């Protein structure tokens, strides 16, 4: 950290300051900024006269717009009466079934670390660490061993990209944008991941949205909805990017490098258009269900500014179900 401070001071004449002084300066600066200041700033933010528009693309694309076309398009957009974005909150009952949950059957406290370990009747283990280091901030992670190592070679292309496709999936009856309107990502979010060795969830919340975070956790295990449109869009984007990348000399180098490094192992080959075309809806859906069908073999870690009497019933209800 100190080396970076000195480097920026030498290169950019940036002030060298301690974290305490930086905090003091930031607090003084922030308290002087008003809402009127921000509104005035953003009114002129997009009206600068020194704008630069840059378009890059591979040589095989011959119909890129020229300077006159770009100026015309820019002027058309600038002259439009663009209304502010309206947040439409879709009122929907996310979880329609009654959740019976699982009771806490064992509770162990580790005095040296302050960690509390809960074991639920369904087998899930939850490690809780209460901390006041960041006010009203709660972080959750859950993981289980397995990942794409559990996928057969015949479904590996779909398994490899299941995690990426799930990030675009509907959650219950909500699209991604509808979910974000209901649960603003500034305050709460949760998503799944699958890598080579494990599958899991990662998320965060404030206390106000804590129940919402656990609802999202339950739905990520039980009701992520992938359809053919998600698959088509994913493949279209990947294949388009592949066709651009292969024009670059780096592509040939990376391709040859991986072939030599991993000795032609089929799970480490550089993905091609043929590889992407093997991704299909059935395999993605089945692999997702296989990896997340049971929370009983997951470990969960929750760290943050929570109260035990508030979070434990949510753990029993949602992780327990």
Segments predicted by a language model, with ranges:
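M16 family metallopeptidases and their MPP-like homologs
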Residues: 1-32, 50-57, 127-129, 134-223, ...
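Proteolytic maturation boundary segments
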Residues: 4, 8-145, 149-152, 299-301, ...
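A common structural junction motif
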Residues: 219-226, 318-321
